[in-house]
Every structure is written in C-alpha cells, then in structure tokens.
Amino acid sequence: CVWDIGPPFGRFEGHPGIHEAIYDVLWPAWQESHHLTTNLVIRFSDPDNASSICDVDCTGTLTSAEDCHIVGATYSDVLQRRAGQWKIHQRNVQIHYFNPVAGTRLAAPA
C-alpha cells in the first residue's frame, strides 16, 4: 500500500510506512482534525479493481498553532478487492491550499 500525502508530509509505503505517517508525522502535527469528503466518483476496471477520486475539506488545529487551519485537497485512490473486501491500495493526495484562519479556534459550544 502507498499513501502519498505530498508536501509538506511526504510519501509512505507498506504497513510500516503508513504506521510512520500516522504516529510519527500526522498525529504529532495535529491537535485535532476533521476530514469531510464529497463528490466521490468510482470507476471499476474489472470486478476486483477500481479507481476513485473525491474532494476533501479538512479543518483542524496544528500542535504548533492556536488558530485553526483549513485544507482543500483531492484524493485519487487505487482500490482492490482482496478476499471479498475492498481496500485502498494507493492514495495520492493533491493539496490545493493549506491556510490558517486567523482568530478562529475550534471550540465546543458554550
């Protein structure tokens, strides 16, 4: 499996690489993040292989910042069915913007 998050995070391969991405790169970078996907299109090349593309909006707070950030990206995935279960074999992420929202903090309603 491959997870190519792109700059500023990098490319990660295999289960050890995905583990590194989560535990050593993403979780230390983000206090909190929420990912919303939309406009999903799936194309099947045969009964066990497909590709998909979708838009993603992420709102979160970096560990190094107080203000929240917004990220707009596209996920392009290679999907495979193995032993009857669909899995993401490869995810390529194209980040379109990664911006702070000055003066905005993520907080529960008062």
Predicted regions: what they are:
Residues C1-V56:
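A solvent-exposed, acidic/Ser-Thr-rich amphipathic alpha-helical stretch
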Residues V101-A110:
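Extended, polar beta-sheet/loop recognition surfaces of beta-rich domains
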Residues S51, G72-A102:
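Short beta-strand edge/turn micro-motifs at domain boundaries
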Residues T59-C68:
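Short, cysteine-centered beta-strand-loop-beta hairpins and adjacent loop/turn segments enriched
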Residues C58-G60, Q94-I95:
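Short, surface-exposed beta-strand-loop junctions and turns on beta-sheet-rich folds
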Residues H35-T38, I95, A110:
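C-terminal-biased regions
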Residues H35-T37, I70-Y75:
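Short, surface-exposed coil-to-beta transition loops
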Residues R11, C68-I70:
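Short, mixed charged/polar active-site loops
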